[in-house]
Amino acid sequence: KSMDVCLEHGLDPSKVVIDHNNEETVKDVLDKGFIAAFTIYPKTKMGNERMVEVVKKYGSNNIIVDSSADWGVSDPLAVPKTASLMLKRGIAREDVVKTCYQNALDIFGTNGKMKEEHWLSPKGIDQAQLYNDNSVLRGQKPRVDSDQIN
């Protein structure tokens, strides 16, 4: 239903991520041109063993492997664990990189605000900086750290 609503409103499916997929939904999502994301959860929804089989069957185009750290049983390290399992099961490194990293970066980076350099070359912390004239501070002295480790 959500894909139909997106299409009815003229959204470009190649710019829409449909998450929480499984083996039963992935084909329809990909066939309609959307990006299929899979949140890997232990014991529920999508597991990493099943994710390996999805990538073997459908390839790495328009597929994103993600994880969660929410109120239920979840594993924030599910993506690297799934990537490792993919490699062990013979999936090519380039396909692992695409599904577990690059595809997400490509789509979420289209807004121009999320760039790989943000975490590959992080800046030091400077709490004296303001965002829209607002600060995270509540009366305390700003923390300013350099990128240097002394």
Regions found by a protein language model. Give the residues of each.
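Active-site glycine- and acidic-residue-rich loops that bind
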Residues: 17-19, 39-48
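Short, small-residue-enriched loops and turns at beta-alpha junctions
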Residues: 1, 23-25, 42-46, 70-74
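Divalent metal-binding pocket/active-site signature
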Residues: 1-24
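Generic hydrophobic/aromatic pocket-lining and core-packing "Φ" positions
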Residues: 3, 26-27, 51-52, 83
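Mid-to-C-terminal alpha-helical segments outside catalytic/metal-binding sites
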Residues: 80-150
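A short, acidic, amphipathic alpha-helical segment used as a generic capping/interface helix at domain edges
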Residues: 47-56
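Glycine-enriched alpha-helix->loop->beta-strand junction motifs that scaffold or abut catalytic
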Residues: 6-14, 30-37, 59-62
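Short acidic/histidine-rich active-site segments
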Residues: 60-77
